[in-house]
């Protein structure tokens, strides 16, 4: 198993290289130049040329990419073009804030979706099931940006129950204050995942309820509760680990919008600011960090799935043995 984990980890390296290549060339080919921020109308052609040389923009794009990779491997992500601060300083604390928000949204989505999905699956065709199915379509269709604005208008500006933006109120670092700031961003960020998880759990529950082992348990006089918690739930919820890894992408994309609307000091807001300012080094850092979060999240999901299901673990080891022959 250890050898498999090492091999899986090594497989992530080509993915990171491809993402960095694609991102760098897309950013480089975008209209404008990073040097535009430093060039003024009063500069001579020679001074403008010197700006390009100082920024390494006089070299070809492949040479610029290799120079960037060399710096990254040395732990130097460069400087922000807008603030002139080291990018490591710019992202300090922001990754943790984004992970906190995404983690809270993910846990909230599971806490809501799993019991609701199980009930819908057990009571297929009931009024509750039909209502929830309709609601999931609404959750998936509602634009996150619009919902965020509506929540701010209602709960912050009209009712005054929740703060409009930020992570903490002025001179208040309490956990309660943090939770108040998280409520609306978490709701917006988790809504689509709640709908997706409900549909997935419901579908799996219905499928499991039609299996022979359920009919056997019913014939032996087992109650619905015993069947659900003793047999159906485990088989229903196990595949959700894989789905959870796949849904990380929606959280990363969602955080980009949610953090910008609610002023949450995380990577998403930093990425939006970097794009608005055409801060290319910071955009590159945001892209790579987002990619790493996705890759690591999916890697952890694979490991958890293998640990939870012995059959998957066995197939992984078999694949590894065949690959080594």
Q: Positions of the model-derived regions?
A:
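Alpha-helical transmembrane segments of integral membrane proteins
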Residues: 2-3, 95-128, 144, 173-325
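N-terminal signal-anchor/signal peptide hydrophobic helix marking the start
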Residues: 6-16
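Membrane-water interface segments at the C-terminal ends of transmembrane alpha-helices
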Residues: 23-29, 70, 134-165, 188-192
């Amino acid at each position: 198993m250890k050898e498999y984990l090492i091999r899986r980890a090594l497989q992530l390296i080509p993915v990171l290289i491809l993402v960095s290549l694609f991102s760098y060339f897309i950013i480089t080919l975008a209209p404008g130049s990073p040097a535009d921020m430093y060039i003024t109308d009063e500069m001579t052609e020679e001074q403008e040329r010197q700006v390009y040389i100082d920024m390494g923009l006089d070299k070809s794009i492949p040479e610029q990419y290799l120079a960037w990779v060399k710096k990254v491997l040395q732990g130097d992500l460069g400087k922000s073009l807008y603030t002139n601060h080291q990018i490591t300083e710019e992202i300090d604390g922001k990754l943790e804030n984004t992970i906190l928000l995404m983690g809270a949204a993910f846990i909230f989505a599971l806490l809501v979706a799993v019991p609701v999905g199980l009930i819908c699956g057990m009571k297929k065709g009931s009024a509750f099931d039909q209502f929830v199915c309709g609601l999931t379509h609404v959750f998936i269709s509602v634009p996150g940006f619009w919902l965020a604005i509506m929540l701010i208008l209602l709960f912050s500006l009209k009712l005054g129950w929740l703060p409009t933006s930020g992570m903490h109120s002025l001179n208040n670092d309490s956990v309660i204050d943090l939770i108040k700031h998280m409520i609306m961003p978490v709701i917006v960020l988790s809504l689509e995942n709640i709908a997706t998880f409900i549909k997935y759990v419901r579908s799996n529950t219905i499928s499991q309820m039609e299996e022979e082992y359920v009919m056997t348990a019913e014939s032996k006089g087992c109650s619905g509760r015993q069947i659900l918690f003793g047999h159906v739930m485990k088989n229903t919820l196990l595949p959700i680990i894989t789905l959870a890894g796949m849904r990380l992408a929606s959280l990363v994309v969602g955080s980009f919008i949610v953090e910008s609307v609610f002023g949450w000091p995380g990577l998403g807001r930093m990425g939006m600011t970097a794009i608005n300012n055409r801060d290319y080094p910071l955009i590159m850092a945001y892209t790579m960090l987002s990619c790493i979060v996705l890759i690591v999240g999916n890697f952890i999901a694979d490991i958890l799935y293998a640990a939870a299901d012995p059959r998957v673990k066995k197939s992984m080891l078999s694949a590894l043995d065949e690959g080594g022959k």
